[in-house]
């Protein structure tokens, strides 16, 4: 089921991608051929080395597999080789009501270069985006879950809603970052080695009224062997908001949980919203957490449930989008 209750109810055109009897050999060619009303793009197993821009609404990228590692979209740009972090992604999504399922999106810059640089796998600035059973692979700045025009502190601005369910997201420093309003349900957030430890998130809510934030619900925080000194997040902007609900945390998570953005002109932790509810595992240490963070009550946690947090004015419920 796709987009239950949406005003557009017409059947979407289907386009195929692959090397065996498909409509197009590349994903970008299929996106280019899609009508403005949207399309279901079915992708055969294979490795697609390209940069993809999805600038149309209602585009679905669906891997034709039950194993997301068999359909791989990958490229190796970096902040240093392009106009900066925002230009380095393998997949750019600006169109609303995007869907991706059963595929991998990767940025493999770090595998081919010893020069550290931000290198984004996915940059999403569309509203009502859904990712299901998707693997996102990178190192620094893997997933840019953003709202585009809110970062400069202007308000009001249009905060974009994004939903990630049963996904695997890998990286080391700030590898889930930006100012979207996003929920991560039942995802594995995996830390890979970095000399200085790492940070799972760098959420960038600039003003309290903007309403963006990240919620991790029922997730698992894992790491490669030997990885340690990893923080749950640090505040990229003054009102950074990150909530962990019912999340299992490995021993690589620092007891303090949260870190200051050390180059900020003034401390940001006092104005950030960092909280947990029913964390478990060796990385769950409520008594040693940074003093500005909070342990939520059950009543407080309810407002971060997916159907509540992402509802918006249109009552969006992404759990029904399959």
Predicted regions, residues:
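Sec/Tat signal peptide C-region and signal peptidase I cleavage site
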Residues: 5-9
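Sequence-level preference for short, compositionally simple segments enriched
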Residues: 10-322
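Sec-dependent N-terminal signal peptides
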Residues: 1-3
């Amino acid at each position: 089921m796709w987009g239950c209750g949406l005003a557009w109810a017409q059947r979407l055109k289907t386009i195929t991608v692959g090397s065996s009897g498909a409509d197009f050999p590349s994903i970008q060619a299929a996106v280019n051929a899609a009508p403005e009303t949207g399309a279901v793009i079915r992708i055969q197993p294979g490795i697609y080395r390209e940069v993809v821009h999805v600038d149309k609404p209602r585009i679905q990228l669906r891997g034709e597999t039950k194993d997301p590692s068999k359909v791989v979209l990958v490229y190796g740009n970096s902040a240093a080789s392009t106009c900066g972090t925002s230009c380095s992604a393998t997949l750019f999504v600006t169109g609303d009501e995007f869907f991706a399922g059963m595929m991998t999106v990767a940025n493999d810059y770090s595998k081919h270069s010893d020069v550290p640089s931000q290198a984004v796998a996915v940059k999403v600035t569309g509203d009502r985006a859904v990712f299901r059973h998707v693997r996102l692979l990178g190192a620094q700045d893997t997933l840019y879950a953003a709202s585009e025009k809110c970062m400069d502190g202007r308000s009001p601005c249009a905060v974009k809603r994004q939903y990630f369910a049963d996904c695997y997201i890998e990286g080391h420093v700030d590898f889930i970052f930006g100012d979207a309003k996003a929920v991560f349900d039942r995802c594995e957030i995996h830390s890979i080695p970095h000399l200085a430890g790492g940070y799972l998130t760098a959420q960038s809510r600039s003003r309290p009224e903007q309403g963006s934030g990240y919620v991790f619900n029922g997730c698992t925080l894992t790491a490669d062997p030997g990885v340690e000194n990893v923080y749950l997040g640090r505040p990229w902007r003054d009102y950074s908001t990150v909530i962990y609900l019912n999340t299992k945390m490995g021993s690589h998570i620092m007891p303090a949980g949260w870190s200051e953005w050390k180059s900020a002109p003034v401390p940001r932790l006092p104005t950030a919203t960092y909280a947990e509810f029913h964390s478990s595992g060796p990385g769950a240490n409520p008594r040693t957490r940074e003093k500005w963070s909070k342990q939520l009550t059950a009543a407080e946690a309810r407002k971060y449930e997916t159907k509540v947090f992402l509802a918006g004015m249109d009552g969006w419920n992404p759990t029904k989008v399959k």
